[in-house]
């Protein structure tokens, strides 16, 4: 018998109950190593003074700005954060890497309890030097839809299994956009027929669909790659006007 998704009303009730068991999203389970430096927009957030201490991902959307999840810096002072660009192996000092402190951060009404507006802009201490290993990614149009069935790519440096150590090199995973159990503020993904998905330790990383960042790793329900529930990403297209307005405002302040 074919699987039938729950009705929208029932799905909303079930999701509200399940959110109490939601956990920060993070690692890539069931993926594979990315080709070195093939995702030049990928950022690693680390603890300052502790090289290799990756705790969240991010995405370079402008030479001076990285997009990540708001919950990544909820309990960490920004002065303790080191942003690393151009990395493939986060445990080594690669010649392609560029390191930055955080100049300031911008939130958009983050609601931690309901896991809404899980988006944060980091202004880097100085503009990145763009190269083959460090490049920006394209933003979607405001409110651009991502249809059910769209094929996308999730990535990160988190654990590759619930009981495995964090990955040293960037991992990526092909995922499918789904609508069951999802909410309007999120994009949800699923990997059919096998145990794979995002998990703990690498929130903030991007969901890339057709070369465009459409999502930010946000949370999972009842553990990693359960094959029962989709993975939840912040829907970037809802925040494009806010992102562009913030960038314009910061750039205007910097003009003489």
From Swiss-Prot:
The active site is at residues 71, 118, 203. Gene3D superfamilies: Trypsin-like serine proteases. Disulfide bonds join 56-72, 152-209, 182-188, 199-224. Expressed in polymorphonuclear leukocytes (at protein level). Expressed in neutrophils (at protein level). Expressed in differentiating neutrophils. Glycans are attached at residues 129, 174. Keywords: Cell membrane, Collagen degradation, Disulfide bond, Glycoprotein, Hydrolase, Membrane, Protease, Secreted, Serine protease, Signal, Zymogen. InterPro entries: Peptidase_S1_Elastase_sf, Peptidase_S1_PA, Peptidase_S1_PA_chymotrypsin, Peptidase_S1A, Trypsin_dom, TRYPSIN_HIS, TRYPSIN_SER. Optimum pH is 7.4. SUPFAM superfamilies: Trypsin-like serine proteases. GO terms for molecular function: enzyme binding; serine-type endopeptidase activity; serine-type peptidase activity; signaling receptor binding. It is found in: Cytoplasmic granule; Secreted; Cell membrane; Membrane raft. It catalyses: Hydrolysis of proteins, including elastin, by preferential cleavage: -Ala-|-Xaa- > -Val-|-Xaa-. Induction: Induced during CSF3/G-CSF-mediated neutrophil differentiation. Its EC number is 3.4.21.76. Residues 26-27, 249-256 form a propeptide. Residues 1-25 form the signal peptide. Inhibited by phenylmethanesulfonyl fluoride (PMSF) and diisopropyl fluorophosphate (DFP). It is a peripheral membrane protein. One of its GO terms (biological process) is neutrophil extravasation. Residues 28-248 form the Peptidase S1 domain. Serine protease that degrades elastin, fibronectin, laminin, vitronectin, and collagen types I, III, and IV (in vitro). By cleaving and activating receptor F2RL1/PAR-2, enhances endothelial cell barrier function and thus vascular integrity during neutrophil transendothelial migration. Plays a role in neutrophil transendothelial migration, probably when associated with CD177. Triggers inflammatory processes in neutrophils by interacting with ADGRG3 upstream of F2RL1/PAR2 activation. It is linked to Is the major autoantigen in anti-neutrophil cytoplasmic autoantibody (ANCA)-associated vasculitis (Wegener's granulomatosis). This complex, systemic disease is characterized by granulomatous inflammation with necrotizing lesions in the respiratory tract, glomerulonephritis, vasculitis, and anti-neutrophil cytoplasmic autoantibodies detected in patient sera. PRTN3 causes emphysema when administered by tracheal insufflation to hamsters. May form dimers. Interacts with CD177; the interaction tethers PRTN3 to the cell surface; the interaction is direct. Interacts with SERPINB1. Interacts with ADGRG3. Belongs to the peptidase S1 family. Elastase subfamily. This is Myeloblastin. It comes from Homo sapiens (Human). The gene is PRTN3.
